[in-house]
Amino acid sequence: NYKVAVVGRFKAGKSSFVNELLDARLASEDTNPETAAVTTFRHGDEVKATIRFLARDEWTKIQSLYQQDPRHIDAHRVLKWHELGKTRKNKDGEMEEGYDLQALEKEYIRDGGFSIEIRLANDGTKKAEADFRRRLKEFTTGTKPHHCMVLGIEIESPAPILDGGVLLIDTPGLGDTERYRVELTEKVVDDVDVEVAEVAAARP
């Protein structure tokens, strides 16, 4: 395999660039820090996403680290987890309930790890594509606690650029306010063959 990582600061257009290369909108695009988990694209006969979650022992270790040293980079994952579980104001200034963190842990954190698959319906409709992106976004967006439990995401696609063993990796932004997500990107870059840096164009 030949690993190509797309990196850059928040809002530099990384995910949009990835989608251009794939000739499909598979990577989440938003004005918020949208890529909160490392996503690897590889060649496959159909579009399918596999989301892998931290095993229970790994999750417990991070939780313990948070109790011992909340300032530790890895502990920030748990800090964000708890923040998203609290009641807070939405973008309209209205109060909304936080997420049920215990229910999410019960569903996704298991002994030996756990994974789920999301498939793109093979009917070629815009609705099917939108539904795939919506379901995937639940685990990639930094505005929901789900991403805190994610170990990694792999998406298969028949995109020609992925043929021949190319792995295209979309990473969290280097300017992300959550330091642990920046660390994820730094670790990925240490193990790739090519690094493509996206830089936002300056406004005239």
Where are these regions (language model features)?
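Globular "head" domains of long coiled-coil molecular machines
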Residues: Y2-P204
